[in-house]
Regions:
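Conserved Class I SAM-dependent methyltransferase catalytic core
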Residues: 217-265
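Conserved acidic residues
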Residues: 41-45, 186, 230
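Conserved class I S-adenosyl-L-methionine
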Residues: 92-102, 121
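Conserved SAM-binding loop of SAM-dependent methyltransferases across substrates and taxa
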Residues: 103-117
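Mobile active-site "lid"/loop adjacent to the S-adenosyl-L-methionine
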Residues: 188, 192-220
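S-adenosyl-L-methionine
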Residues: 1-95, 123-187
Length: 266
């Protein structure tokens, strides 16, 4: 079960726009917000500022940011390949179900790949993280910097154009998959590695308490195979035993990468 400790939500400025954003967060399902600091212990915080929303746990602060999606988009616009897109084989007009949304890095790349007529559904088991990412996507265009680097600016604009195609849902992926009709999406994607990265990375430390470190279940994979029209894709550590345990064929490539992609064709 994910940690449901209260999160202290606060404004950096008494600004009408920020108050509206605060009200939006308070309406999100499943979140345990408080506006009163605890005298017994330090609570994790979500701070709404004129420069974005920040999650803080201890000494570490995390803003919503496209992160590696920005670098990957620069590479894609420059004509280079992307292993995630090679694994998922997403096409214009496809529907992608990202069953482990995390911070939405892969979902942003997927949303760009499926184009204007495509759709990305992102599932996140933590209600706080789901709200944080949805807010970031809602305000993505505001993040675009005045970049002198034309390639970087083009990547920002491409991701901002793709971000509205992502629908964030709070929920446990296996239960959500059970409710979907058979063959209702093109690709189902799992990236449980995000949870392990949160545990090890200092930059991701504010997200650690909301991460689910449980392994993927066979039932979730069976449901994903029922729901997908084309394929189910798993990202894991290179040489991970999870591929064999869950029945995925590992794709070749990425000789120097620390990760591999596995695929089940349906």
């Amino acid at each position: 079960m994910l940690n449901n400790k209260p999160v202290l939500i606060k404004l950096a400025h008494l600004d009408p726009d920020l108050l509206e954003r605060l009200e939006w967060f308070q309406q999100q399902p499943g979140c345990n917000w408080t506006i009163t600091p605890s005298g017994e212990e330090d609570l994790p915080e979500l701070t709404i500022t004129r420069h974005g929303v920040f999650m803080t746990d201890g000494a570490k602060q995390l803003p919503f940011h496209p992160s590696m999606a920005l670098i990957r988009m620069m590479n894609l616009l420059g004509g280079r390949s992307d292993r995630y897109l090679e694994a998922t084989q997403l096409k214009a007009g496809d529907t992608l179900l990202d069953a482990t949304l995390g911070l939405g890095t892969e979902a942003l790349i997927g949303a760009w790949a499926v184009g204007e007529n495509g759709r990305v559904v992102g599932l996140e088991q933590s209600p706080v993280l789901a709200a944080f990412v949805q807010d970031g996507l809602n305000h993505f265009a505001e993040l675009i910097p005045d970049a002198r680097n034309k390639q970087k600016l083009a990547a920002w604009v491409a991701l901002a154009s793709a971000s509205p195609r992502i629908e964030v849902h709070w929920g446990e992926h296996c239960e959500y998959l059970k409710r979907l009709p058979s063959r209702s999406v093109n690709v189902v994607y799992f990236d449980p590695m995000f949870r392990n990265t949160c545990y090890r990375s200092d930059s991701m430390e504010p997200l650690h308490r909301w991460s689910d470190h449980n392994p993927l279940s066979h039932e979730a994979i069976l449901q994903a195979c029922r729901v997908a029209q084309n394929r189910v894709v798993l990202k894991e550590r290179k040489d991970s035993r999870e591929f064999q345990r869950l029945g995925f064929d590992v794709l070749s490539g990425g000789q120097y990468s620390k990760v591999d992609y596995g695929v089940i064709l349906v």
